[in-house]
């Protein structure tokens, strides 16, 4: 269902009602989807779990954090700006990074392109692990999930 500039779905994980939100904005405007949904459902930032890609992590690596800066990620920058805080948990999925020598558009092409070969396999596996990490955060808490998945 399209609401808040996002595809939304409500489901239950471990007995907890969960709103899934996939912004339909450009990445650098993700906060325009997250903040209205958070306001509507009266969700404090610490109850918002963001899953995003991260080019600073090797392909397939997960990193869970309970809060932090954007790390240069434009989607996270937008969410931080819209919520007015960095204090929300996130799961970062490593997608690796391109060789940028001589190509100023290499990073843009990398994150907007399609992964192939071993990187694609690693990221596919990481996405399955990220889904398990989401369940772990909801059912067991962030500290336990960080110990399991970091």
Regions found by a protein language model. Name each.
Residues 72-75:
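Hydrophobic alpha-helical segments within soluble ligand-binding/sensing domains
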Residues 1-67, 77-92, 98-109, 113, ...:
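Nucleotide and nucleotide-moiety/phosphate-recognizing core
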């Amino acid at each position: 269902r399209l609401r808040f500039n996002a595809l939304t779905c409500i489901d239950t994980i471990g007995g907890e009602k969960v709103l899934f939100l996939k912004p339909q904005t450009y990445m650098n405007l993700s906060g325009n989807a997250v903040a209205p949904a958070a306001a509507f459902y009266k969700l404090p930032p610490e109850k918002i779990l963001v899953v995003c890609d991260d080019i600073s992590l090797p392909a397939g690596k997960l990193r869970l954090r309970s809060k932090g800066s954007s790390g240069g990620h434009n989607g996270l920058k937008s969410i931080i700006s819209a919520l007015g805080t960095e204090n929300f948990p996130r799961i970062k999925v490593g997608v690796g990074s391109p060789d940028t020598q001589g190509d100023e558009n290499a990073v843009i092409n990398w994150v907007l392109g399609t992964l192939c070969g071993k990187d694609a396999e690693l990221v596919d596996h990481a996405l399955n692990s990220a889904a398990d990490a989401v369940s772990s955060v909801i059912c067991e808490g962030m500290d336990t999930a960080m110990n399991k998945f970091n």
